[in-house]
């Protein structure tokens, strides 16, 4: 098992490396390429993966806690199961990935591309989806209670069976042009 603590990598090409069971703490990765990398069963705490590329990367059974994925791109990755605790995906591209059933509670997904992403049965309680691009996203049976969302999500994502707060239900109605009136 490798441990990388307080280290920094810029523009590093990790393509096709086996980094399974890697442990990072306070590591900084900027513009690195993790395409084809095996990061299965890895653990990351307080690490940042900024503007990195993850294509066909295996991340299953991994844990990310207090990490930043700012501006990183994920394409055709194996992401389930995955443990996420206070992860910042601001400006990341997760479009087209299978995130079914993941717990994204409290994660920041501001201005994240979730186009055609499968988020069915995800827990997004308290998540920040402000400005997220959600065209074709599948949020069926997801738990969105307490999440911050823009009106565009209510119009562009599939939400059959999603759990929402009353305020969110009112926002959904307004986004669809419904007029709510009492009795």
Swiss-Prot record:
Domain Pentapeptide repeat: 113-147
SUPFAM superfamilies on file: Pentapeptide repeat-like (SSF141571)
Leader sequence residues: none
Superkingdom, natural source: Bacteria
Domain remarks in the Swiss-Prot or TrEMBL record: Each subunit forms a right-handed beta-helix with 8 complete coils that stack upon each other.
Role, per record: Might be involved in fluoroquinolone resistance. Also inhibits fluoroquinolone-promoted dsDNA cleavage. Increases fluoroquinolone (ciprofloxacin or moxifloxacin) inhibition of gyrase supercoiling activity in a concentration-dependent manner. Inhibits DNA relaxation and supercoiling by E.coli gyrase.
Family statement drawn from the similarity comment of this UniProt entry: Belongs to the pentapeptide repeat protein family.
Quaternary context: Homodimer. Probably interacts with DNA gyrase.
The protein's name in its UniProt record: Pentapeptide repeat protein MfpA
Organism annotation: Mycobacterium tuberculosis (strain ATCC 25618 / H37Rv)
Lineage: Bacteria, Bacillati, Actinomycetota, Actinomycetes, Mycobacteriales
């Amino acid at each position: 098992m490798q441990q990388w603590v307080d280290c920094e990598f810029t523009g590093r090409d990790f393509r096709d490396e086996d980094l399974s069971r890697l442990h990072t703490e306070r590591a900084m990765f900027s513009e690195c390429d993790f395409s084809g990398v095996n990061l299965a069963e890895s653990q990351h705490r307080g690490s940042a993966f900024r503007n990195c590329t993850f294509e066909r990367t295996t991340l299953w059974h991994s844990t990310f806690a207090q990490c930043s994925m700012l501006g990183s791109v994920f394409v055709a990755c194996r992401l389930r199961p995955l443990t996420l605790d206070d992860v910042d995906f601001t400006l990341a591209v997760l479009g087209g990935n299978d995130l079914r059933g993941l717990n994204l509670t409290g994660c920041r997904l501001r201005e994240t591309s979730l186009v055609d992403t499968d988020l069915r049965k995800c827990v997004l309680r308290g998540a920040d989806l402000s400005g997220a691009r959600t065209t074709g996203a599948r949020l069926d049976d997801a738990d969105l209670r307490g999440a911050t969302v823009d009106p565009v999500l209510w119009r562009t994502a599939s939400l059959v069976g999603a759990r929402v707060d009353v305020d969110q239900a009112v926002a959904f109605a307004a986004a669809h042009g419904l007029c709510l009136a009492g009795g």
